[in-house]
Amino acid sequence: MHHLLEQSADMATALLAGEKLRELILPGAQDDKAGALAALLLQLKLELPFDRVVTIGTVLVPILLVTLVFTKNFAEEPIYCYTPHNFTRDQALYARGYCWTELRDALPGVDASLWPSLFEHKFLPYALLAFAAIMYVPALGWEFLASTRLTSELNFLLQEIDNCYHRAAEGRAPKIEKQIQSKGPGITEREKREIIENAEKEKSPEQNLFEKYLERRGRSNFLAKLYLARHVLILLLSAVPISYLCTYYATQKQNEFTCALGASPDGAAGAGPAVRVSCKLPSVQLQRIIAGVDIVLLCVMNLIILVNLIHLFIFRKSNFIFDKLHKVGIKTRRQWRRSQFCDINILAMFCNENRDHIKSLNRLDFITNESDLMYDNVVRQLLAALAQSNHDATPTVRDSGVQTVDPSANPAEPDGAAEPPVVKRPRKKMKWIPTSNPLPQPFKEPLAIMRVENSKAEKPKPARRKTATDTLIAPLLDRSAHHYKGGGGDPGPGPAPAPAPPPAPDKKHARHFSLDVHPYILGTKKAKAEAVPAALPASRSQEGGFLSQAEDCGLGLAPAPIKDAPLPEKEIPYPTEPARAGLPSGGPFHVRSPPAAPAVAPLTPASLGKAEPLTILSRNATHPLLHINTLYEAREEEDGGPRLPQDVGDLIAIPAPQQILIATFDEPRTVVSTVEF
């Protein structure tokens, strides 16, 4: 009974998911929410962005420049005339109006009919306005000749592109799915491909009609001719303003002239004497600048038009219709791709500009991006996943009982040592939550691992490994600690005390000389006691680098006593012999005086050549390579083991020259003869 209830719930969930997905991929009421209001607001764009740029550059910008010139002429006087001081106000106004009308430079000694005219300065603003109107003629002709036909073509084409997707989603995909299900679970991929190919061959009458329409538009070139004629006409008409403005910029540079008042226009001799008045045109410089800007702007627009036409009819490879329609079963001819001069290419550009009118555009983009899968295959897989509602393919979490090993467990430990911690995810079912978003919400499993980690016991602090550096420095630190605590007495010869245990790793004053940190224990079990590794073997030079307490006692070296404490022996001042150079300088030391120092034999040539046994410590200042540990190394080799000298005073005596074996690390030994002077 429980199994039947669970299966019915799974079936209901599958049906609900299928309904939501059908609303997403199939046309429904959500596509027509705006209705007629959206149709009124959305109007077809009959100009491409490139066409709008050309119109702005050739029409609107020159009009703005003309407006600037007219504004300057109305804001101030277009001409300044410097009349004599005896002229009345009316005479001055008459002289200014007469000179603005004539605009002829009365050169002395030149016939009046040959006087140069400055009328181009006065005519330039009107010429710019006329050129702007002329450059708008191609756009106006395109609007009248192609707008009606282009509007009807775009309406039909955009609607059919939208319907192609709907027909494929509603008709072909369910039919393919039904045929695949009829084959049973043993169907192969080859049989599936054959079913899909056969379904593609079976086309509806609407699809056949749309393919015929595309074929007819591919053989027609009416819109292509109109589009090409529009831009070629712009190139031809722009030659007129460019030539005129270049001539004006090159010839009209004069802004001052002499106006002859009272002279007859035809230069008759019967006229009275003329009064010459100097005049100036203040807007000449501004007009020259505007003419130069207009020339550059028109040249740039012509270059842009040429590049766009070459790209459109020669080098363009992408096509909005070709990229979209072949994904929904509409066949296109390759000859349309080779021949760019046809209406289908012009319509493709305008379809891309009006793509907001295609309601299923997002779905078409999804199909186009999935280039490795056919659209029918994608829809078939979606519907097949929703149609299966058996026990193994329900939208419940069937694999929720799979055990997952805790990532915090230590992988180095053997499996038999302890039972590995296991995280068991609870079994839960996915519940559909209806929202305004048609997309299904992703199922999020609870983070069980995070809960287990939060419930773990506090992890123990890591234990630091003891390195060779700590082994060498620990005796020195222990002796220094005893010295500063007040234990400065003479320890006397005796056995070396046992080394102090290393400080606890959690003490704050512990000095760490190594960066090697033990990794944290990432398990839930108790931390095991970590065995301290043995000290690394050091070389002979490192073993003698620091003296232990037993060696200090044997050599007669003791820490300096505390203040006011009686010295056990007489303190010997620093002598001049080089034997003191071999004492270590690790801390303050005092040397005990021996009972009787033996006599030193004088140096003779016979004694220089003789090699005596090594019984006394001697270090020559001229050989800095000698160290105090060299003595012990040589004596250990001769006697077979380490031993201390019988008399401490022998350390201070100056021995006779002898042969000393020097052993530095593992290098070959060298015989050195020392000579005392």
Swiss-Prot record:
Changing residue 89 to W: Reduced currents. No effect on membrane location. Loss of ion selectivity. It comes from Homo sapiens (Human). Residues 492-504 have a biased composition (Pro residues). Belongs to the pannexin family. Residues 11-47, 147-226, 316-643 are cytoplasmic. Residues 71-123, 250-292 are extracellular. S-palmitoylated in neural stem and progenitor cells. Glycans are attached at residue 86. GO terms for biological process: cell-cell signaling; monoatomic cation transport; monoatomic ion transmembrane transport; positive regulation of interleukin-1 production; response to ischemia. It catalyses: ATP(in) = ATP(out); chloride(in) = chloride(out); iodide(out) = iodide(in); Na(+)(in) = Na(+)(out). GO terms for molecular function: gap junction channel activity; protein-containing complex binding; structural molecule activity; wide pore channel activity. One of its GO terms (cellular component) is endoplasmic reticulum membrane. This is Pannexin-2. Homoheptameric. The chain crosses the membrane at residues 48-70, 124-146, 227-249, 293-315. It is a multi-pass membrane protein. Residues 393-423, 454-510 are annotated as: Disordered. It is found in: Cell membrane; Golgi apparatus membrane; Endoplasmic reticulum membrane. Ion channel with a slight anion preference. Also able to release ATP. Plays a role in regulating neurogenesis and apoptosis in keratinocytes. The modification Phosphoserine is found at residue 593. The record marks 415 as: Cleavage. Keywords: Cell membrane, Endoplasmic reticulum, Glycoprotein, Golgi apparatus, Ion channel, Ion transport, Membrane, Phosphoprotein, Transmembrane, Transmembrane helix, Transport.
